[in-house]
Amino acid sequence: MKKIDFTAILFGLLLSAIAAYFMLRPTPSQSAPASSIPTVQIGNLIWDQTEMTIGDVKGFATTGFISAAEKKGGGLNYEGGFVQKPGWTWKTPYGVAAVDLEPAVHLNQKEAESICRYYGKRLPTDAEWTSAAFLEQRANPPAGYVKGQRYPFPGGSTPAVSHCLSGCGDYKGVAPAGALNRGTGHVITKTTKPGVNGMYDMGGNVWEWTATERNGGYMTRGASWWYGPERQQESDLESKPEDIAVVYIGFRCVADAVKQ
């Protein structure tokens, strides 16, 4: 009787399984929907160049997503204390129709993480965020930026490219007249000028959630249209409860660069 070589059979089965894995595994385009947000690579990370937009959250909402702010009837604004604003949600940040390229706000930290994950991305850690925001890492940055230099603002040496309450660039937010007790609201993404590493609105416009826990909440970075430029600096450590959804808090997503 001929002796069966089980080792060869097992080895063949193993090779077949490996081949099947590589043929059938999903590519990034197959495994996650495509985001409309432009990206830039900084080190080993691929960053969304702008904050998450209403348009991309609409894509996530096709899964049946309804935000906590929607379920409660509206998100929050600060008016000497947090006040619920009926009808203010990620789709209608100031209670009226918004355009798809506005930053998505009124979303809590867990919702932000879920939206990033839907697009095959994640929220950045605080260390990742500050590195991308303040340390110029482009090989050949444009005039006004120097590779390896750490800047005081995400916009560079000054906050001039950013949108904030005062002392920043000459921008006006899209909030309807009389809707806010302070400031003019956010501007549409990519309508300011790029800053360190070619990123838009890392300083000002809206706060950005991170994945880093602190003081029982999660750190937010970059400040917003509600504050002056001093809150944009790296030394400003701010954390907020994970379940809070506010008119001036948004986020951006990041992905780990895949080496081919």
Regions found by a protein language model. Give the residues of each.
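Extended beta-strand/loop cores of jelly-roll/beta-sandwich
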Residues: 2-127, 134, 217, 237-260
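Functional-site microenvironments in short loops/helix caps that host divalent-cation chemistry
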Residues: 85-238
